Regions:
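Short aromatic-enriched loop/helix-cap "lid" or pocket-rim segments at secondary-structure transitions
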Residues: 47-50, 139-141, 174-179
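Short, solvent-exposed amphipathic alpha-helices that sit
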Residues: 15-27, 143-157, 179
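Short, glycine-/small-residue-rich phosphate/pyrophosphate-handling segment
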Residues: 96-97, 109-164
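Short, catalytically relevant binding-site loops at active-site mouths
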Residues: 90-92, 134-135, 171
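N-terminal beta1-alpha1-beta2 submodule of the flavodoxin-like/Rossmannoid cofactor-binding fold
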Residues: 1-110, 114, 183-204
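Membrane-targeting and insertion segments and their boundary/processing signals
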Residues: 71-75, 129, 174-178
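Cofactor-binding loop segments of dinucleotide-utilizing enzymes, especially the Rossmann-like FAD-
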Residues: 8, 39, 129-131, 167
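Glycine-rich phosphate/pyrophosphate-binding loop and the adjoining helix
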Residues: 149-204
Length: 204
């Protein structure tokens, strides 16, 4: 069994990456081969609308034709048994790097033909891992649930199944006194990080 986790956060050792690492450790304990990819290490763009993936008889039909740092990863994803996408929430959505990755990952599959089935390598178990500074209640008030549903729907459409883990009210800094962030209670943030975040790691 092969599992790849995609870190859409610019931070390699913070909330999102930590949750992904725990998810991979769980997979490893079951005998899986695992890999963690940091998107911010790669040089790539989102979909460039070349439509080479839909060109009849084209050498890239059904696959993204762009040759950059993302190309080998997109090819490797075709071989996995499970795929985990992780991202912090910035302004109500996943990071720009994750969004660009999603465009490249998903758009290679559908074709514009009547009654055409979505092409995909095989059925793959997938999951989303989200981290965010807001509380669960505030996330609902701000309409995050729709974004969660839409993103899960994309993975279900193209890969077959999806689970989601939401980690709320995360710790942003080690030392809040160094930043212009007085609206937050650093003691409460630290307390939640020490008490709730380990439980989120177990759920991952």
């Amino acid at each position: 069994m092969k599992v790849i986790a995609i870190n859409g956060s610019p931070r390699k050792k913070w909330n999102t990456a930590t949750l992904l690492e725990h998810a991979l450790k769980g997979a490893e304990s079951a005998g899986a081969e695992t890999k963690l990819v940091h998107l911010y290490d790669l040089d790539y763009k989102g979909c460039i609308s070349c439509f080479a993936c839909k060109l009849k008889g084209g050498k890239s039909f059904g696959k993204c034709a762009v040759n950059d740092d993302l190309a080998p990863l997109l090819e490797e994803i075709r071989t996995v048994d499970a795929l985990i996408l992780g991202s912090p929430i910035y302004f109500g959505d996943v990071t720009g790097e994750m969004r660009s990755f999603m465009e490249r990952l998903f758009f290679q599959f559908p074709i514009y033909e009547p009654d055409a089935a979505v092409r995909q390598p095989k059925k793959v178990r997938t999951a989303w891992v989200y981290t965010m500074n807001v509380t669960e209640e505030l996330a609902r008030q701000m309409g995050y649930d729709r974004m969660f549903r839409d993103n899960a729907g994309l993975l279900e459409r193209f890969f077959g199944s999806c689970e989601s883990l939401m980690c709320y009210d995360t710790l942003q800094f080690d030392d809040y006194s160094k930043y212009a962030a007085r609206r937050f209670d650093p003691v409460a943030k630290r307390k939640r990080h020490e008490e709730a975040f380990p439980e989120d790691c177990k759920r991952a």
